[in-house]
Swiss-Prot record:
Predominant subcellular localization, coarse grouping: cytoplasm
Quaternary state and interactors: Monomer.
One cellular component term from this protein's GO annotations in UniProt: membrane
Name of the protein: Translation initiation factor IF-3
Any one GO molecular function term: ribosome binding
Alphabetical list of PROSITE patterns matching this protein: IF3 (PS00938)
Known function: IF-3 binds to the 30S ribosomal subunit and shifts the equilibrium between 70S ribosomes and their 50S and 30S subunits in favor of the free subunits, thus enhancing the availability of 30S subunits on which protein synthesis initiation begins.
Name of the coding gene: infC
One GO process term, biological-process aspect: ribosome disassembly
Taxonomic source organism: Salmonella paratyphi A (strain ATCC 9150 / SARB42)
């Protein structure tokens, strides 16, 4: 097994001795402006406070630096990004398959599943499959899709409704209505 040097990932902000400017625009711990000071003076102030000097805006003239606890800053940043990820809802397309001869009991079970999908904010794809001689009775399939559409009109809006059969199936896509 080979040993190797562990490559340190580059930090997004330069801190303490990594800052290269001679003068910096300094911001205090509480966000108050301390004016333009020399880098040495800024580093002395951070030593006194026992925290880090972090370069916030390296492209400014002079660069903007802030006195802060860098570890705490990174923790807060990662915590807020995790919160934002939690709030994002990924919309999925859930599929339910019907047949032209789907009985009433099965229809109700599938309808309940569709209602659950739409209430959770997901799109629903209703696939109606035809087998054998069922192809001759496409109007029965259209009746099933129209019934589903009518039963879910309070919860969903139709995104796509089949005008003709594609292969051996008809596909209808429903999207949840926006909540007011």
């Amino acid at each position: 097994m080979k040993g190797g040097k562990r490559v340190q990932t580059a930090r997004p902000n330069r801190i303490n001795s990594e800052i290269r400017a001679q003068e910096v625009r300094l911001t205090g711990l509480e966000g108050e402006q301390l004016g333009i000071v020399s880098l040495r003076e800024a580093l002395e102030k951070t030593e006194e406070a026992g925290v880090d000097l972090v370069e916030i805006s390296p492209n400014a003239e002079p660069p903007v630096c802030r006195i802060m606890d860098y570890g705490k800053f990174l923790y807060e940043k990662s915590k807020s990004s995790k919160e934002q990820k939690k709030k994002q809802k990924v919309i999925q397309v859930k599929e339910i398959k019907f047949r032209p001869g789907t009985d009433e009991g099965d229809y109700q079970v599938k309808l309940r599943s569709l209602i659950r999908f739409l209430e959770e904010g997901d799109k629903a794809k209703i696939t109606l499959r035809f087998r054998g001689r069922e192809m001759a009775h496409q109007q029965i399939g259209m009746e099933v899709l129209n019934r589903v559409k009518d039963d879910l009109q309070e919860l969903a809006v139709v995104e796509s409704f089949p005008t003709k059969i594609e292969g051996r199936q008809m596909i209808m896509v429903l999207a949840p209505k926006k909540k007011q």
